[in-house]
């Protein structure tokens, strides 16, 4: 390896919005980063996954404006 051309590889502290923090090695220029989700709070990994959109766009439209169109013709 050539000297002086490779970025410095150092420890980085990552803190999640849930409060979980862990350390990893990276060439990132920062000493710490903030994450929105991690494996401790992500719905897929926690098993608390929920279906956000059960209906389609047409169902959502009919739910919002169905009462308006059914009254007059």
UniProtKB/Swiss-Prot annotation:
Keyword Transmembrane: no
Superkingdom of origin organism: Bacteria
Pfam families in the cross-refs: Ribosomal_L31 (PF01197)
A GO CC annotation given for this chain: ribonucleoprotein complex
Alphabetical list of InterPro entries matching this protein: Ribosomal_bL28/bL31-like_sf (IPR034704), Ribosomal_bL31 (IPR002150), Ribosomal_bL31_A (IPR027491), Ribosomal_bL31_sf (IPR042105)
Co-factor binding details: Binds 1 zinc ion per subunit.
Cofactor(s) this protein cannot do without: Zn(2+)
Binding site for Zn(2+): 16, 18, 38, 41
Keywords, in A-Z order: Metal-binding, Ribonucleoprotein, Ribosomal protein, RNA-binding, rRNA-binding, Zinc
Gene3D superfamilies linked to this entry: Ribosomal protein L31 (4.10.830.30)
Single annotated GO MF: metal ion binding
Gene Ontology biological-process annotations: translation
Subunit structure, interactors included: Part of the 50S ribosomal subunit.
Described purpose of this protein according to its UniProt entry: Binds the 23S rRNA.
NCBIfam families named among the record's database cross-references: L31, PRK00019.1, PRK00528.1
Similarity remark: Belongs to the bacterial ribosomal protein bL31 family. Type A subfamily.
Annotated protein name in UniProt: Large ribosomal subunit protein bL31
Organism the protein comes from: Vibrio parahaemolyticus serotype O3:K6 (strain RIMD 2210633)
Lineage, highest ranks first: Bacteria, Pseudomonadati, Pseudomonadota, Gammaproteobacteria, Vibrionales
Gene name for this UniProt entry: rpmE
């Amino acid at each position: 390896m050539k000297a002086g051309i490779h970025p410095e590889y150092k420890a980085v502290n990552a803190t999640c919005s849930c409060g979980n923090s862990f350390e990893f090695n990276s060439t990132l220029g920062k000493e710490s980063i903030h994450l929105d989700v991690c494996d401790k709070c992500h719905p897929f990994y926690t098993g608390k996954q929920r279906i956000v959109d059960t209906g389609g766009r047409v169902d959502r439209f009919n739910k919002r404006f169905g009462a308006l169109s059914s009254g007059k013709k």
